[in-house]
């Protein structure tokens, strides 16, 4: 489902894989890395097909406009500009080479979730989704700490934070906030905002 429009869209596998790889990785990255991402995206899509609880029939959500999940052809055109033809040809060839490959666990497509970076160590699946998957266990990811945008600062006033909490999470505005800074050192499991 396209999060920005609320519409359920259906894409041919090849188009989905090209858009999914483009959403997750720079097209300039090594061939084998891009092919591995295509296999992970294919496996994840099939896993979501088999485990989706979406009432609208969608396997999962994406937001092409924000370049998340899968990029549509129109978004790829605007994102790549004059490099569209060359980039699309490159990704197409790499996707074509692995389009039939899927990762399985116990005779079913594996839930090969992926993300841009972690805090130096990945998290166990049960801490993220509440379900233990034996192949999604914590591993070292310390090279993430050298990535661009690994660390950044965002300053919000109490009023701005209250507005965002109300708009995005439906948390009532006007709750009292204590002064002080929140510093994220590792994955936060909870954060007390008020009281």
For each predicted feature, which ranges?
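Conserved, single-site charged/polar hotspot
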Residues: 1-195
